[in-house]
């Protein structure tokens, strides 16, 4: 019998490389107030290679395209703003030093999913009557490590 997981306790963390080209194994800081994560689909594009001798279309795998932005939904809080601004500042400094910033989607009692990317400045989402104020955190992905043992 399979034991399914739920989303209680899922978190988004980040850490900048201390050594260029090496994903950090520890020292990740948590981004608070996350409400939703994006789907990260690692399905490669398909390139058609059919020729006139084929009765059916044929394809080969092409470039993997995970999209141009991973968008995380969060409740807008002072703690979120502070944490996100720290992440953006550290990522900018890391990039200027030719180092990457890594993100970890941490699932309790399971592995984590890792990717490197560039976080963008915090904007303002639309607002309406009788609603919580949310924010969308945008991260431009530039490397996917995938599933691995969670950070310490």
Regions found by a protein language model. Give the residues of each.
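Solvent-exposed edge beta-strands and adjacent loop segments
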Residues: 2-76, 116-133
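Polar, enzyme-active/binding microenvironments
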Residues: 16-21, 109-110, 149-151
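Acidic glycine-/aspartate-rich tracts in secreted/extracellular proteins
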Residues: 76-80, 144
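A generic structural signal for short coil/turn motifs at secondary-structure boundaries
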Residues: 81-82, 128
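Short, acidic/charged, Gly/Pro-enriched secondary-structure junctions
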Residues: 82-116, 120
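Short, charged, solvent-exposed linker or helix-capping segments at domain edges/interfaces
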Residues: 83-86, 148-152
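Short beta-strand and beta-hairpin "edge-sheet" elements
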Residues: 104-149
């Amino acid at each position: 019998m399979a034991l399914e997981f739920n989303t209680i306790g899922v978190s988004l963390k980040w850490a900048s490389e201390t050594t260029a080209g090496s994903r950090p194994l520890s020292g990740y800081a948590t981004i608070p107030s996350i409400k939703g994560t994006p789907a990260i689909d690692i399905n490669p594009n398909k390139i058609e290679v059919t020729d006139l001798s084929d009765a059916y279309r044929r394809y080969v795998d092409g470039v993997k395209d995970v999209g141009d932005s991973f968008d995380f939904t969060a409740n807008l809080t002072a703690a979120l703003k502070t944490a996100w601004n720290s992440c953006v500042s550290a990522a900018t400094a890391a990039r200027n030093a030719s180092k990457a910033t890594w993100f970890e989607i941490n699932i309790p009692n399971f592995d984590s999913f890792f990717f490197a990317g560039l976080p963008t400045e915090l904007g303002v989402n639309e607002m309406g009557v009788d609603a919580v104020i949310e924010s969308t955190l945008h991260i431009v992905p530039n490397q996917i490590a995938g599933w691995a043992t969670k950070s310490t």
